[in-house]
Amino acid sequence: MSSRVHKVVLAYSGGLDTSIIVPWLKQNYGNPEVICYCANIGQDDELSGLEAKAIATGASKCYVEDLREEFVRDFLFPLLQSGAVYERTYLLGTSVARPLIARRQAEIALQEGADALAHGCTGKGNDQVRFELTYMAFAPHLKVIAPWREWNIRSREDALDYAAEHNVPVTATLKSIYSRDRNIWHMSHEGGILEDPWQEPEEAMYTLTTAPEAAPDEPEYVTVGFDQGVPVSVNGERLGPVDLLLALNNIGAKHGIGRVDLVENRLVGMKSHGVYETPGGTILRVAHQGLEQLALDRDTLHYKDVIAHRYAELVYYGQWYTPLREALDAFVRVTQRNVTGEARLKLYKGNAMLVGRRAAKSLYNPDIASFTMSDSYNQKDAEGFIKIFGLPVKVQALLEGR
């Protein structure tokens, strides 16, 4: 299983798994120096006391970096512009975060002169792929240690026993039945009752959003402004990326916006059942789509939907740092040049309804589209168009003797 390493940088969250990995690495890899790395991408109170906790478990130091601005600006907003959604509903909150975390972890490892990288991803999940593909892109020569593919710990009970045996301070209990991942974009829930896809999740599971039934009885209107596809304002107030997303999270959560229940196809071959809460991201997606309806011509809009599907797969599969993603981003950037304007949404009991949109360079022309008589569109022209457009249908019918 193991071979001696001298210094390892661990992707660290402070949860049960990564807490016990610190002494496990020392025990199984020749007592190396263990450096913990944690990226602040919007976990909030989960980061409280993290450095002290890492040291208490045996780490020599712990980096905690605030990457929220970069995460929103360089990852979430390009994702939004692309229109990527995995398997029709998942807004990719966990998937898109891993490349940034793993890249900075690898950069810290190179800076520290480490000879190994470690993560706490299970051998059944997608995250192991996302982390390790990023390691390959930025530190291909470093050894990768994935304890869940090596150790004999097979359950939460085993992990808690190991923590107690090695005096690792943890707050987890057997009552903590859900596996969660949180960042500024979303909260994910797996495990527990969700392992039966027929069972409705209990309301107590949700941590970000109000139940639609308990949401305000009056709708709330919110206007989101965009500049070339990038969100820049909420209700007329210009905000930076982080503040803008936080504002929309608060507004959306209050109205129960952004709950998704999904049985998804994991990259590693199995299906899994998860529930996601993405209040601000859902508002942004609906608003952005509404503005694109005005700004994009038919062919570009339709082909962009094709790109969005592949972009979603690329993000889900951990292929962020690839030429394909850069090439698709170049295409998306061109499509966003005229996506400047505002979209207005009506939020009510779990629904985010587009009720208005206006663009600086809108392709919608009311003089042409109106049902009233207009000199801008000669309806007689449609006759010749239909004859040409329908010619293949007519020829096929004649061939078959109809």
UniProtKB/Swiss-Prot annotation:
It comes from the Bacteria. Keywords: Amino-acid biosynthesis, Arginine biosynthesis, ATP-binding, Cytoplasm, Ligase, Nucleotide-binding. InterPro entries: Arginosuc_syn_C, Arginosuc_syn_N, Arginosuc_synth, Arginosuc_synth_CS, Arginosuc_synth_type_1_subfam, AS_cat/multimer_dom_body, Rossmann-like_a/b/a_fold. It catalyses: L-citrulline + L-aspartate + ATP = 2-(N(omega)-L-arginino)succinate + AMP + diphosphate + H(+). It is found in: Cytoplasm. GO terms for cellular component: cytoplasm. PROSITE patterns: ARGININOSUCCIN_SYN_1, ARGININOSUCCIN_SYN_2. GO terms for molecular function: argininosuccinate synthase activity; ATP binding. L-aspartate binds at T122, N126, D127. Pathway: Amino-acid biosynthesis; L-arginine biosynthesis; L-arginine from L-ornithine and carbamoyl phosphate: step 2/3. The keyword Amino-acid biosynthesis applies. L-citrulline binds at Y90, S95, N126, R130, S179, S188, E264, Y276. ATP binds at A11, Y12, S13, G14, G15, L16, D17, T18, S19, A39, G120. Its EC number is 6.3.4.5. NCBIfam families: argG, PRK00509.1. Homotetramer. Belongs to the argininosuccinate synthase family. Type 1 subfamily. This is Argininosuccinate synthase. It comes from Roseiflexus castenholzii (strain DSM 13941 / HLO8).
